[in-house]
Amino acid sequence: NNAMQLIEDQSEQLTGVLPNSYTDFSDEILSELLRIFNNSAIDEVGGDIVGRIYEYFLNKFAKNIASDDGVFFTPKSLVKMIVNIIEPKSGVLLDPACGSGGMFIQSGDFVNQSGMNANSAMTFYGQEKVEYNAQLCLMNMAVHGLTGVIKSGDEANTFYHDAHNLDGSCDYVMANPPFNVDKVKAESSESAKRLPFGMPGVNKNKEVGNGN
């Protein structure tokens, strides 16, 4: 448990994010995990091996969850396609529905592959209503060596709030919008400067339905 606190002490963006109890795991399992990761064969693989391992288990986790809020993690192949089309190079990148942070990871990798340093060239901002998903995002960014500002909770509900006050200030906005979200209150959204083209269909309850 102290190990997690020591990690948080070294990374401001992970403060309050990491789990602080491992009572669900036996000492034998934890010892075996340490033995596996403390293996020279892993070092020999090179590259961002820890980040790739994290992504592997994150994808496994994503396949086993579903939510009435329409929350799901965008497949890596789709994220990669979006990034390759937009080709981010430098500046401010916002994902207003960032989930586990896939857009940031692939954008960072794209920038690094071009010979630049992603943390120097890019500034990452994210909004994620579900706090647990925002924690996954911050951990995902950390194991890939990226920094960013992620806001979560009601203030980060992108249907109603520009949590970072970035209207007109972003170089890139990437997102896989939460199309399944229903009952968005039109009155709380229609005054947003981020919606210059107006609102989609509003029903008799003054709500916007999902995108299906």
Regions inferred by a protein language model and the residue ranges of each:
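Non-catalytic, mostly N-terminal accessory regions of nucleic-acid modification and defense proteins
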Residues: 1-89, 149-152, 157-160
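Phosphate-binding glycine-rich loops and adjacent basic patches that engage nucleotide phosphates
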Residues: 11-21, 39-48, 98-102, 121, ...
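A short, mixed-charge helix-start or loop-turn motif at secondary-structure junctions
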Residues: 64, 119-120, 199
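Conserved S-adenosyl-L-methionine
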Residues: 68-175, 180-182, 187-189
